[in-house]
Amino acid sequence: MLVLGIESSCDETGVALYDTERGLRSHCLHTQMAMHAEYGGVVPELASRDHIRRLVPLTEGCLAQAGASYGDIDAVAFTQGPGLGGALLAGSSYANALALALDKPVIPVHHLEGHLLSPLLAEEKPDFPFVALLVSGGHTQIMAVRGIGDYELLGESVDDAAGEAFDKTAKLLGLPYPGGAKLSELAESGRPEAFVFPRPMIHSDDLQMSFSGLKTAVLTAVEKVREANGSETIPEQTRNNICRAFQDAVVEVLEAKVKKALLQTGFRTVVVAGGVGANRKLRETFGNMTVQIPTPKGKPKHPSEKVSVFFPPMAYCTDNGAMIAFAGAMHLGKGREVGAFNVRPRWSLSEIVK
């Protein structure tokens, strides 16, 4: 079956075609990054209008790439939430109108479930079960995934998401939009331990996380640098050092929490998904991940166990239609109820987990 996927939750318009027998047939994406850059962030009204302009051309582009026509589409999947209300409505209205015209089922998809399943689009796919780290600008959550639709929330950020902390810290440092990616780039030139920031909740027994205090620590460091220099300008190397220290702190917390999740579940496979999954430092750190089962005092230590870690292809780390088409196809195959028109801007992932 050929499923058309539509993503419009924020500032990317994504359309893709997924074939349940042949895999991903085509994938088209338009980013609004340049349009929002002059405002320093996403402007919801502009985002909605641009989605409306892009959806038809992107759909036709995907059909052309796949050598298919509208008549070949068997179902239409769309992002129902969470996201910007107007942006979601643009995609939902288009998906439902197209499905009605084609007399095909429409499949509402949770945006985060799309990210959760995106590594399954890679040539080398993880096997169930696995621990999933969803890490993006809006969410940071750790899940136990035992199969399609079988998810358990293990822990999440109690305040800022990791990606949000990246963006806000970048803004504190005066970096251009989108700041998170620029911060990661500058961190490559930072000196290790020139600054040392706290690792919030890293030693807590649970799998909850917090990043707002880390952002505050950066603000304090920036203010001290400016006061010492008698200038609002932060020296280039100092700025890079702050970026490095911030990134190291975030990645260390994420690594520690995921290791705890592996010990808690007994799983030895990790999937990382979401926009921050493109971060080079995160990929390097998780790529070398091992876990060691705790032993009673005085007993020989267990050998470290290697962990299999999977990331989605870079093209599917950010918002995209391919993950929505895939998630929709999986639910269509399992007989999920379809036909919901409404959008859900504040849809918690906890509502679809066990």
Swiss-Prot record:
Its EC number is 2.3.1.234. Substrate binds at residues 134-138, 167, 180, 279. Keywords: Acyltransferase, Cytoplasm, Iron, Metal-binding, Transferase, tRNA processing. The gene is tsaD. Fe cation binds at residues 111, 115, 319. InterPro entries: ATPase_NBD, Gcp-like_dom, KAE1/TsaD, TsaD. It is found in: Cytoplasm. SUPFAM superfamilies: Actin-like ATPase domain. GO terms for cellular component: cytoplasm. GO terms for biological process: tRNA threonylcarbamoyladenosine modification. It comes from Neisseria gonorrhoeae (strain ATCC 700825 / FA 1090). It holds the Pfam family TsaD. Belongs to the KAE1 / TsaD family. This is tRNA N6-adenosine threonylcarbamoyltransferase. Its main location: cytoplasm.
